[in-house]
Amino acid sequence: MTEGGLGTAAAACLFPGFYGLGAPDWLKPLLADGLGGVVLFARNVRDPEQVAGLTATLRAEQPALLVAIDEEGGDVTRLEAETGSSFPGNLALGAVDDVALTRRVAAAIGGEVAAVGIDLDLAPVADVLVDPATAIVGVRSFGSDPQLVARHVAAFVEGLQSVGVAACAKHFPGHGETAADSHLELPVADAPLETLRERALPPFAAAAEAGARAMMTAHVRFTALGEEAATIDPAVIGLLRSELGFEGLVMTDALEMEGAGGPGGIGEAAVLALAAGADALCLGADLTPEQVEGTQVAIVEAVEAGRLTEERVHEAARRVGELAAWTSPRPHSDRAAGAEAARRALAVEGDAVVGEGALVVELWPDPTIAAGEARHGLGELLGGETVRLREGDAPPPLDHSRPLVLVLRDAHRHPWQRELVVPAAVVVETGVPAWRPERVRAFVATHGAGRANLQAAAEILIG
């Protein structure tokens, strides 16, 4: 714990994650010192009652605490990580292209996080899917048309915030410009500034116009703007403030990610991000308590050394406090919206009805860090036998007496999946349907692998 107003302001900028179903002891001094927020992950979730108890315990220590979560719907869910999301993700909503339905789904997601005491949803993803090869965006994007993405980002923001949960559009100024994963490296986007204005920025402008209370920066270097990752580049956050007129909270993506920049470690990255204009510093869940506490100390020491102004730290803390004061989460249940959206997002070609008893072969690529390992699949919804294969696994012998269902995931990025497709198969693509197999019995595109998406596909396959 640090002493005095500067230390409290520094604590207000921090949003750490932590392990476990309860509040760890090391977090309590930070809460007492005015910690701004925490970010919950699947590792903090057992069931709604437990999460509600956890958030209540945290706020008993710090009543103004913001509690954030990545609850995007579809492939990225924390509250339903064990079962899969009851709501489809952005690509499915973009495929339907009904902004009223997107608004309704977002309100339903907001209502579910509100019910357990969460008041900041790190959604929607506002990245345009410029490169289908990108693993970090993929089905998390509403699509490849900037105007379509913009109108659905606005609708999602409006839906979330209609139930008093703050939206945080991400990843400014756009992660869809590069195929690299910023969890693992610093991606570089070489598009000219005018191209960014035409292609990447419209969804973020729409989010600002819709009243989004927060925006998250990308750990991507945009050569048209500067030499640093966007999170620590004053030109990038200046663009957000001046050109888009955004006055809300600017939050960083997790600073322990490889793409965050700052060779001096997490504390140095935090100082650089604040100096660049960020307000809230996401620290993820993989840092030690000493690293989190050290980040607060690093901010104070940077001010004392004249590398960061005290006014900047207090300005950031003020924005965190203003967001906390704005939130008023109101529980709201509407899972029917998720089922409707998932059904409408399905694209079916050919005879997809297999009934019960099919052999289901699920081809699973390595998971992304953002989505995590899926714990559910289509096979369990269809009955019969399910075989799950990773790259390099030998396929099972085919039994021509029963139907074959092949479940793919971003086959356009994985040649090994494409090589296993046979003409007799009903092929179900649960990722971005950028590759369409020829001469198969049927092809089904779900536009996502959330439970709602897979349930909709199962209804079609069972008949």
Predicted regions and their residues:
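Short acidic/polar active-site loop segments enriched in Thr and Asp
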Residues: 36, 119-120, 213-214, 279, ...
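N-terminal hydrophobic targeting/anchoring segments and the immediately downstream early-domain regions
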Residues: 1-67, 74-81, 405
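Alpha-helical scaffold segments that flank or form the walls of functional sites
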Residues: 97-118, 200, 209, 269-275
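Second-shell residues forming the walls of enzyme active-site clefts
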Residues: 17, 43-67, 75-79, 144-307
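A charged helix-plus-loop insertion that forms the helical arch/lid used to bind
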Residues: 83-97, 141-143
